[in-house]
Amino acid sequence: MSLSPTQFRKAMGCFATGVTIITLDLDGEVHGMTANAFASVSLDPMLVLVCVDQSARTHDHLHAKKRFGINILGEHQRVISEYYARPVRAHEHAEEEAGARFDRTAQGTPILNGALAYLECRLKSAEDAGDHTIFIAEVEDVVVREGEPLLFFQGKYRQLGEDAPE
């Protein structure tokens, strides 16, 4: 039996994930991309990973800048996720129309207003893995807010439902 990329993608779609936007500063401008291949790696030291397609515009910027934010989206931020998932932005003020507004950390890293949580990260290592790169970063600061997460499952955005039966 030969496994197709479509079958693999369908199987991976059965794993529900949260949705993040990776943000970084490029000469005073916010650059970002939607990512759901994100995970905690270690508590001591506090490490996370994010996987980025090597053809994505953000890929080379992460290598060069070394400092970035991971914004964990709330259920009300689907439009923002869709905007940052596009490979090409519509026009200069489209991010504001999508509802994306940013503050800055003391180090200048963009923080998405209203995100459920935010992690400020410094790149520790990068490992090529197929057509993606696994970026491992040390978490230097976090902000956590109340709310429900935006989820992604079987190719669609979702919200939390009821608790699973015991």
Q: Where are each of the predicted segments found?
A:
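Basic, polyanion-binding surface patches
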Residues: 1-166
